Structure formats: structure tokens, C-alpha cells
């Protein structure tokens, strides 16, 4: 069964809330809600001491296509799109694992 845009929107919103993403009041040009979550990590750096790093993911759905924006310490890493909300969550989990964080 092919999913409609409304079904993908509902599944996306449910998955975002389930995985700790929050709607902070921002919307896209087409009125979609932008969900965001930030991870913090403190690492010990030789000859420097503790250093805090952050990883932020902003996600929204545009006409049935989940769009993910990645930021590492405030620097934009890029934008990615996925065919379904479940694939987007799986990709976010893998991106975070490679960056040293956990979903």
C-alpha cells in the first residue's frame, strides 16, 4: 500500500516525538513543523583539557519527503532527504553513531 502525504506526515511527527525531537515553534516555507534535537558531549583533549562539542539535527517533512539538516558545533554539515520517515530515523541513528553520539 502506497503511503499518502498525510500518512507520511503523521508517521514522521510520531517518530520525531518518540525519539526526543521537539517542535520549537519554527515552520518551513510550506508550513511544515521543524523538529530539533541537540546532543552535547565533553571530551578530554590532551594539552588542552575538557572540550564540549554539540551535534544538532533539524528535521521537517516537505510534500511527503523527510528532510534532515545536520550541524556540528554550529557549523552546517549538509542537508539530506529520505524516501520515508522510518528510513530517516534509521539514517539519523547511523549518522549519530558515526559522530560518536547516541539517539
Please provide the spans of the model-predicted regions.
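Negatively charged, low-complexity tracts enriched in Asp/Glu with abundant Ser/Thr
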Residues: 1-46
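Residue-level detector of alpha-helical secondary structure
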Residues: 13-17, 89, 93-96
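Generic detector of low-complexity/intrinsically disordered segments
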Residues: 17-18, 26, 53, 72, ...
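Intrinsically disordered, low-complexity regulatory segments enriched in Ser/Thr/Pro
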Residues: 44-90
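Hydrophobic alpha-helical elements and their junctions with loops/disorder across both membrane
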Residues: 66, 95-98
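Short acidic DE-rich linear segments
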Residues: 100-103
Amino acid at each position: 500500500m502506497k503511503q499518502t502525504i498525510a500518512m507520511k506526515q503523521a508517521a514522521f511527527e510520531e517518530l520525531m516525538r518518540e525519539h526526543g525531537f521537539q517542535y520549537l515553534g519554527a515552520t518551513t516555507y510550506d508550513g511544515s513543523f521543524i523538529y530539533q534535537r541537540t546532543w552535547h558531549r565533553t571530551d578530554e583533549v590532551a594539552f588542552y583539557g575538557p572540550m564540549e562539542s554539540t551535534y544538532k539535527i533539524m528535521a521537517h517533512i516537505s510534500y511527503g519527503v523527510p528532510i534532515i539538516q545536520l550541524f556540528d558545533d554550529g557549523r552546517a554539515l549538509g542537508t539530506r532527504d529520505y524516501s520515508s520517515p522510518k528510513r530517516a530515523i534509521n539514517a539519523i541513528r547511523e549518522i549519530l553513531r558515526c559522530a560518536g553520539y547516541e539517539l
